[in-house]
Amino acid sequence: MKFIKIKNTIVNVAEIKLIYTHDQLLYIECTDIVHRFDFGTEIGAMEELNRIYKQLE
C-alpha cells in the first residue's frame, strides 16, 4: 500500500481511507479518484492533486 502524507484536510473523497495520527497529520490511501480537496482554494487543490499523482507514478 502506498500512503501519502498531507498536512491539510481532505473532504468529499471517493474510496480513500483516511488515517489521522497523534500529531494530526493526515495519511491517505489512494484507491480511487479524489473528487475535491479543501485546501482553501481550488487552485491549491489542483496543485496538491498534481503533486500527489506525480508521487504515485
Regions found by a protein language model. Name each.
Residues 2-7, 15-57:
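Acidic, Ser/Thr- and proline-rich intrinsically disordered linker/docking segments
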